[in-house]
Amino acid sequence: MLQITLLALCLISVDRAKAQDWSHFVRTAGHGLQIDNISATIKDASSTYLYGIEVDNDIPGRYESFLDPTEKLQAIKAMADSAHAIKNHAFVYIAGLEIITANSDTARHTFFKDHPDWVQRNVKGEPAIFGGGDAFWITKGDEDAWITPYALEWRKIYMERIRQMTATGIDGIYIDIPYWMCHFKGWQDSWASFDKYTVAAFRKKTGINALKQVKIGDWNDPNFISWVNFRKSAISEFVSEVKENMKSVNRACKLILEIYPGLSEAEARIGTDNYQLYKIADVITHEYSPRDQAYKDGGGGNSARSNPLGWMRYMIAMFTFRAMAEEKPTWMLSYSWGGEEKINPSDAMKNLFVSQVMSGTNSWDAARHVMSGSNDYDTRKQVYKWINDNEQLIYTKREPMSPVGVYFSPNTRDYFSDSWERSYFGTMEVLMQKGIEFEIVTPRTLDKSKSGLLLIPDVRSLGEEELGRIETILKEGKKHVVFTGQTGEYDSSRRKVDKDRIKSLVQAYKENTTFIEDDPGSDFDKFMQWGYDVSMYKDRELEYQNSRSYEELEETLSKYYLPSVEIKGGGGCVSQITSVKGKPTVYIANFTGLKSKENAIPIPERDMSITFKNLPNRGAIVNFIPFLEKSVQLKGVWNKNDLTVSLPSFLRGVILTLSD
């Protein structure tokens, strides 16, 4: 009876979401796929409230099925039919540019033995071939090969397999990171691939000989910049062809792309640029987790090892991914617990899930550092049921009201990654600490940004087209624009330009611009790394010793930011102020007291108040929805058309929204 009830609840939610795109409501976990385990997978999905079921039988990533996919195609079709029978959806995992041959040490035929010219190579000509121990998913005796997308015979077969999988009726094809091999030990600085096909394609496109005319790793070499951009374009073109082949068979089938890591030089290094690829893929899954004291890009780490600043930066990253995605969903393949002795797996999972809920991203439950299983099935069931019950509030598009805009520059991220990361994250940390409504603005959304105040933090690479659009905004007089640091000193190809072009713009539009010579974002990030975690372990306010640049930024914020919602208190919280279906809504996650490997239970937030300003209806009611709990209504105090509520104590997070 219990199983029937759970399934019925799941089906009700699925029916409710069916009118919208299913990929926006996914809460998933991974499963192997054989004909004889489909019923167990369906049972797991039904009993733990999965919506969108991942299965893995990887046709093109295993040499045997790359050659003959018949048996695996039958299993994919059976899985799709079974998922549809319970009004759910399923998607199948496949490799991108990686292929494994089992038992290669005894096999007569392996991918590399049969096709040595199809694999990626470093500048010395050494092939990207690996074995057991090089990565946890490679079994001893197996051959792991990395393929160039310019091996056209392989590519033709790959696209045929894509069409065959799509024809099974599966709802999505999930492609594991298609990247140039700059990941495994000894290959991080390879800037591969220098195989004959890739080198020839680069020379045809640019006239440059990659083997002789590119200074590998030299960001001041224009030929190296051309190589970097060519490699990114090559991956994007490959993914575009995959999508074309999928949609030629079934336009409803989703292209789901996994990407690692996220916001660092690594995008340029491996060639898989999430900003570019959001234009192509239907969904991007970010393999990206909270970090501990390293605070660098979140490719590694897990929830149990993260400190409060790591959590804040993880949420800033997710907000950035959501800005890149625009109307598309963002899935997070993040890890919660890896055996940390002092941490209860359930607590680590709840911290991870609450951060994803409050950022509007979709959750993927996984055991340890793999894509399948769970560290605690009861916790998954509890959380996924709560998400199921509140999915419309969590995943309906969040609209800005009166935000401060922060400009995200993909080129600056690639070309000046270290300084960019400090400035960008530090600027966002300022807004997080002050409880200010924010809007992350990208080159694609610059013209439709709703912010009245736009911060451009040390955006060193700024193209003429971007600069022209910023000047158009200034001419319209609708925004105040703040330039900081070395903004605009390089063009979109990293060529040094007139350093005074930003100052000339500021001079021409004095009333609508501010130029801060130093970089307040970097200054604030240094301060946060110095003292934030120590303060939040003990729930103490952190007093910032102002720098001159920070004072200039603070003065500009106080002058030009006119809030729709004001937040007081919550120094260890990360908040997003937004509008959902026309109603002011606030999402809050609490990380106070969390400590890497030591404590995963937050100190409850007890001293926080929120003021909703200039409301049109004095009869508005505040709905208070704590994470994993039921909604309750709060009474507030009116001052003219402003409504202030003192929040009850909450542990991990809360959603507040208004109703009439």
Language-model region placement:
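Sec/Tat signal peptide C-region and signal peptidase I cleavage site
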Residues: D15-A19
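Catalytic domains of carbohydrate-active enzymes, especially glycoside hydrolases
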Residues: I35-R62, A167-G172, V283-I284, L352-S359, ...
